[in-house]
């Protein structure tokens, strides 16, 4: 499903740069947000097939953004080095990806996620 538009929410500059490079190299259109406020703005501007959000961010929680994106009909994933500490109740509706993630694992996870049926948007 290359060509799909992805929103990546990642506050670590080095991690973000690598993930964007890998995803764009695989043919995906990627928009980067470095904080929750920027991600909210991007979600209001455009539709995304997939939103990948870091869990712990300086100005909020990536799960909140993933929940909003899912309500808009996007597929969602949480990418975190702390994934094992997440509450199953809060993260149940999202894919959970562990950091660090290898480029081949990232692409496989994105392809798997995009191959799933979309969550219907809330009315």
Which sequence ranges carry the predicted segments?
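Conserved acidic carboxylate
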Residues: 10
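Two-component/phosphorelay signaling modules centered on CheY-like receiver
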Residues: 13-31
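C-terminal output helix
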Residues: 20, 86, 101-113, 118-123
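Acidic catalytic/metal-coordinating carboxylates
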Residues: 35, 61-64
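Active-site residues of response regulator receiver
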Residues: 54
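Hydrophobic/aromatic residues positioned on beta-strands within the core alpha/beta folds
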Residues: 79-80
């Amino acid at each position: 499903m290359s060509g799909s538009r992805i929103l990546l929410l990642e506050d670590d500059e080095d991690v973000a740069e690598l993930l964007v490079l890998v995803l764009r190299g695989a043919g995906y259109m990627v928009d980067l947000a470095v904080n929750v406020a920027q991600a909210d703005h991007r979600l209001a501007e455009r539709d995304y097939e997939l939103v990948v959000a870091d869990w712990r961010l300086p100005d909020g929680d990536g799960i909140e953004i993933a929940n909003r994106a899912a309500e808009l009909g996007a597929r969602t994933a949480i990418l975190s080095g702390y994934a094992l500490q997440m509450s199953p109740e809060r993260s149940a509706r999202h894919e959970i990806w562990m950091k660090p993630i290898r480029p081949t694992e990232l692409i496989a996870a994105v392809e798997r996620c995009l191959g799933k049926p979309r969550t219907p948007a809330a009315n």
